[in-house]
């Protein structure tokens, strides 16, 4: 994982799977290569292998279960996503919560497998406790802003600044800001406030011109880095 971090969560929009999902992955890859920026995509579990075999950018799962291998019908384990070609996974997204004991077990196994991990939290007070588990990054997202088009950068900047204070208590863990990120200006502000990057979904997955939106994101991130 490299700063600036831009993580695109495909979720399960119409543009996230099948031919359209693959096209979206290639659009993201094109922007990443043209701007020399590492952009991570979190794709549906059924798309991991197909996408990972088609692009050179990091492909993540959107969720993993902390259950052991064995009789767990429908579970998505760290071993399964590794075998499918994923480089890492989101954990504990507000739309896919996991129990603390399962998350801890999943993290330990992901580390053994060499997989990156992004723990999602809904408030800054949880940033330091989750960072102590030593994931690759912690993503803070106020759930009330997710998918609204109202960015955390503008509506709740104190969430980012407080999260920055919390992440500094633990060395070696990145901080990602998310929820309502829709423009390069949102990305710029989030990073100027101290985050290492942003997470986004609907702003790109539902965009008429996703390449244009993503380029705007990257330009905002680069501008913030240049001014640090």
Curated annotation (Swiss-Prot):
Pathway: Carbohydrate biosynthesis; gluconeogenesis; Carbohydrate degradation; glycolysis; D-glyceraldehyde 3-phosphate from glycerone phosphate: step 1/1. Its main location: cytoplasm. The keyword Metal-binding does not apply. It catalyses: D-glyceraldehyde 3-phosphate = dihydroxyacetone phosphate. Substrate binds at residues 9-11, 146, 180, 201-202. Coiled coil: none annotated. It is found in: Cytoplasm. GO terms for biological process: gluconeogenesis; glyceraldehyde-3-phosphate biosynthetic process; glycerol catabolic process; glycolytic process. Pfam families: TIM (PF00121). CDD domains: TIM. Involved in the gluconeogenesis. Catalyzes stereospecifically the conversion of dihydroxyacetone phosphate (DHAP) to D-glyceraldehyde-3-phosphate (G3P). Belongs to the triosephosphate isomerase family. This is Triosephosphate isomerase. The lineage of its organism: Archaea, Thermoproteota, Thermoprotei, Sulfolobales, Sulfolobaceae. The gene is tpiA.
